Amino acid sequence: MSRTHVVVGAGVVGSTLAELLANDGQEVIVITRSGSGPTHKNIKRIAADVSDLSKLLEIAPSAAAIYNCVNPPYHRWAKEWPPIAASFLGYAEKTGAVLVTCSNLYGYGPVDVPMTEVLPLNAPGVNGKVRAQMWFEAK
């Protein structure tokens, strides 16, 4: 099994995760549009379009896990999330890597009961529907 961890995104969550993994002795590849990310001897930073599955596979032919820590601008979710999510899912399926997603609760929409995983995905807005579709496809 590969010890490589692919972290996509270098915001607060992605950078912190990459540093934690690297400090634990893991090999980490951080992929962003610009090639940014934390500096560490166990971290390799790469600039790439993560919606391109073939590029992800070229960068990391195998991995223990791929971590989705990206978030396109809200006004571009409907256009940008579907190909990114499909690429991550395809990567996990082809490599056997675990797909870990840093997400939010938008897919559920407004609720007036305690939130649990069994709540239906009833998002009324575009972004919530995009998020719900990503979850549905990843199940």
Q: At which residue positions do the language-model features occur?
A:
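Conserved N-terminal Rossmann-fold NAD(P)-binding element of oxidoreductases
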Residues: H5-G9
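Cofactor-binding loop segments of dinucleotide-utilizing enzymes, especially the Rossmann-like FAD-
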Residues: A10, R33
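Hydrophobic/small residue at the entry helix of a nucleotide-binding pocket
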Residues: V13
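Conserved Rossmann-fold NAD(P)-dependent oxidoreductase catalytic core, especially the SDR/UDP-sugar
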Residues: E27-I29, A86-W135
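NAD(P)H-binding glycine-rich loop region in Rossmannoid oxidoreductase-like domains
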Residues: S36-T95, Y108
